[in-house]
Regions:
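Long, low-complexity, charge-biased intrinsically disordered regions
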Residues: 1-215
C-alpha cells in the first residue's frame, strides 16, 4: 500500500481498493451509481459515507450507534474524526453549504475558496469576465518554450489546480477551458501563463453562483 500511494501510477486505484476492503468488512456496501458512495443498513440504522481520496463524510440517523461502529473501524484503519458538521453555513473541503430543511433547498458554492485564491494570486484588481476563455485562444505544443522556467511552470500549475477544483465542483461551464490549458502544464509559454487569468475573471463574475436545487 505504501508503494502504491507514493510510487505507482495506479496509486488511486490501489488506495480505493484498500478502502473498499476495510469498509465492506464493517458492513458498508459500495453503491452502483457512485463508487465513492457507501451505504450500511442494519434494520432502521443507516450510515452513508462519501469518499474523496482520504477524506470521508458520514451521515447517520443514530449518532450513538455510529460512534460505536466508528470505533470498530479505527481498529483496521487509522482515521480520526473532525466531529459533527452543521450543514447550515458550513464549509467542507472548500465547499460552502447552505441548507434549508423546511424549504427542502440545498446550495453548494465556493465563494470563500475563490476569494482566497484571487487574493493568493493577486487578482483583486482584475475586472470580472462573462466567459471563462477569451475567443480565439489557441495553443499548440509548438508554442511551448524550449527552456522550462520552473517558477513560471509552478505558478501555471497552481492556477490550473485551483481552477480545476472549482470547475469540477461548482462551476462546470469552465471545465473545457481548464482542461484545454491543462494540456500545457509541463512547459507553458508566456502567453499561456496569461490564459488562466481569464478563468479567474470568470470566477469573479460567477462567485455567488454554485449548484443549487430542491428535493
Amino acid at each position: 500500500l505504501r508503494k502504491a500511494l507514493y510510487g505507482l501510477a495506479q496509486a488511486p486505484r490501489r488506495w480505493h481498493d484498500h478502502l473498499v476492503a476495510v469498509f465492506e468488512k464493517h458492513g458498508l456496501v459500495r453503491t452502483v451509481v457512485d463508487p465513492c458512495l457507501f451505504v450500511l443498513t442494519v434494520g432502521t440504522f443507516v450510515i452513508k459515507m462519501g469518499v474523496h481520496v482520504d477524506d470521508f463524510l458520514f451521515t447517520t440517523n443514530s449518532p450513538t450507534k455510529f460512534d460505536a461502529w466508528f470505533k470498530r473501524v479505527t481498529l483496521d484503519l487509522k482515521i480520526s474524526s473532525s466531529g459533527r458538521i452543521d450543514l447550515t453555513g458550513s464549509d467542507y473541503m472548500s465547499l460552502s453549504i447552505t441548507y434549508d430543511q423546511a424549504a427542502s433547498f440545498l446550495k453548494i458554492s465556493q465563494h470563500d475558496y475563490i476569494k482566497k485564491a484571487i487574493r493568493m494570486f493577486g487578482f483583486e484588481h482584475l475586472k470580472s469576465a462573462s466567459t471563462p476563455m477569451a475567443s480565439g485562444v489557441k495553443f499548440t505544443k509548438a508554442d511551448m518554450p524550449e527552456t522550462v522556467d520552473e517558477r513560471r511552470r509552478d505558478l501555471f500549475r497552481r492556477m490550473i489546480g485551483v481552477a480545476r477544483w472549482v470547475s469540477r465542483n461548482t462551476c462546470f461551464e469552465a471545465t473545457f477551458a481548464v482542461s484545454y490549458l491543462a494540456c500545457f502544464l509541463e512547459n507553458p509559454s508566456e502567453p499561456m501563463l496569461k490564459a488562466p487569468v481569464q478563468i479567474f475573471r470568470y470566477f469573479k463574475w460567477t462567485i455567488e453562483a454554485g449548484v443549487e436545487g430542491c428535493y
